């Protein structure tokens, strides 16, 4: 079993302290996603707004217990985000910043693109969308149909994206598109909003309301050549193979959110059902052990990706297990409070609704299982 050392324990303590500010707005976000503006000046929101999640000279740092952190390691990220998610994952997702787009820009952007992009985040609270998922093919890069067509000295972007976090709030984003068939024909471009031909609408949801999911329609949106990420790189380093390194770093962070939701549900039962029959207590203990098992898997995944960003098999396994864990544990915990549990215990009901969303963040479980199975086959191991 992996135990957090003193340094990571200090980070966990600071995250738990900061998470208290999210508790004041979490329930309100369920009714009004714009309630996030009330907490933008809290330490946690200020930090999330400018975090880069990658080694950089201007990465903001936080201190705790005499240690300094910049969240440039995946292990630090999973420790930090799990604690925040225990309080309210919707509030975490409502934060300004570029938790997914930022690492991609750091990887593929040239110096001018990186400076321009991160200057936007430093200037004011800025929400950034990450538009990959499409209505017909989900997040399957091979089925991507959004087009980036040459147009004079630049390009025109045409297509539709769906289930894009923070899209209605964003004034900046990354869109994935295709310039030609095949894996080497995929590109990621920087887009500003509003823009002619760009339409963004909010999608109704019953869980993760703070994430403000949206649909994006692009009709010949003008894209300057200097907004195409990876233009200075060879084709093999700017397409989907490079994106995989970013996805591998993001998946343990998403898994940490699912684990945080499951932890919160178990802790809720322990607080509100102090007297349990032996069989019921055994079931709760089994749920808690399952949470810890997936947590250990995710910590191992984070260390593996930190060691080799191309090694994503554990990251995919952890993300799939955490998504199932969040759903199973929250539903099981509702059973401790009878038929009216969702009405009588709205916080637990919210956890159950939010848990459903983890499945669809950063690739559904069938995608993650394919990644794991392909890795096993490639390594010559039986499945």
Segments from the language model and where they lie:
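FAD-binding glycine-rich core of flavoenzymes that anchor FAD
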Residues: 107-128
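A short core secondary-structure module
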Residues: 160-199
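Amphipathic, small/basic residue-rich leader segments at the start of a protein or domain
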Residues: 1-92, 379-383
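Glycine-rich beta->alpha junctions and the first turn(s) of the following alpha-helix
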Residues: 2, 202-292
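N-terminal glycine-rich flavin-associated loop
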Residues: 66, 89-112
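A short, Trp-centered hydrophobic/proline-enriched beta-strand micro-motif
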Residues: 49-51, 123-132
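C-terminal helix-coil-helix/basic helical segment that borders enzyme active sites and/or dimer interfaces
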Residues: 20-31, 270-278, 292-343
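Glycine-rich phosphate/cofactor-binding loops in nucleotide/flavin-utilizing enzymes
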Residues: 337-383
């Amino acid at each position: 079993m992996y135990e957090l050392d003193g340094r990571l324990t200090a980070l966990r303590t600071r995250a738990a302290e900061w998470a208290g500010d999210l508790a004041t707005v979490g329930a309100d976000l369920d009714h009004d996603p714009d309630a996030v503006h009330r907490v933008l000046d809290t330490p946690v929101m200020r930090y999330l707004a400018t975090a880069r999640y990658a080694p950089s000279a201007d990465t903001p740092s936080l201190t705790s217990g005499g240690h300094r952190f910049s969240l440039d390691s995946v292990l630090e990220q999973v420790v930090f985000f799990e604690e925040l998610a225990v309080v309210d994952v919707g509030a975490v997702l409502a934060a300004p910043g570029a938790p997914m787009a930022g690492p991609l820009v750091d990887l593929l952007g040239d110096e001018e693109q990186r400076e321009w992009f991160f200057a936007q985040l430093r200037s004011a609270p800025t929400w950034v969308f990450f538009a990959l998922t499409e209505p017909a093919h989900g997040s399957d890069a091979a089925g991507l149909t959004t087009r980036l067509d040459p147009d004079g000295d630049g390009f025109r972007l045409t297509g539709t994206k769906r289930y894009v976090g923070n899209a209605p709030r964003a004034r900046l984003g990354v869109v994935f598109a295709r310039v030609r068939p095949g894996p080497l024909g995929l590109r990621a471009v920087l887009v500003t909003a509003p823009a002619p031909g760009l339409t963004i609408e909010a999608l109704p949801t019953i869980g993760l309301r703070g994430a403000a999911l949206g649909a994006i329609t692009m009709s010949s949106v003008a894209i300057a050549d200097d907004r195409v990420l990876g233009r200075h790189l060879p084709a093999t380093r700017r397409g989907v193979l490079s994106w995989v390194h970013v996805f591998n770093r993001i998946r343990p962070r998403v898994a940490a959110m699912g684990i945080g939701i499951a932890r919160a549900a178990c802790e809720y039962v322990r607080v509100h059902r102090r007297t349990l029959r032996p069989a019921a207590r055994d079931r709760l203990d089994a749920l808690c052990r399952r949470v810890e098992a997936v947590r250990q898997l995710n910590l191992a995944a984070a260390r593996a990706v930190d060691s080799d960003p191309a090694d994503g098999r554990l990251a995919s396994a952890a993300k799939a297990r955490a998504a199932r864990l969040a759903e199973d544990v929250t539903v099981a915990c509702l059973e401790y409070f009878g038929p009216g549990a969702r009405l009588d215990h709205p916080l637990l009901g919210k956890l159950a609704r939010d848990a459903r969303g983890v499945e669809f963040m950063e690739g559904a479980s069938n995608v993650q299982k394919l990644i794991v199975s392909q890795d096993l086959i490639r390594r010559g191991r039986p499945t």
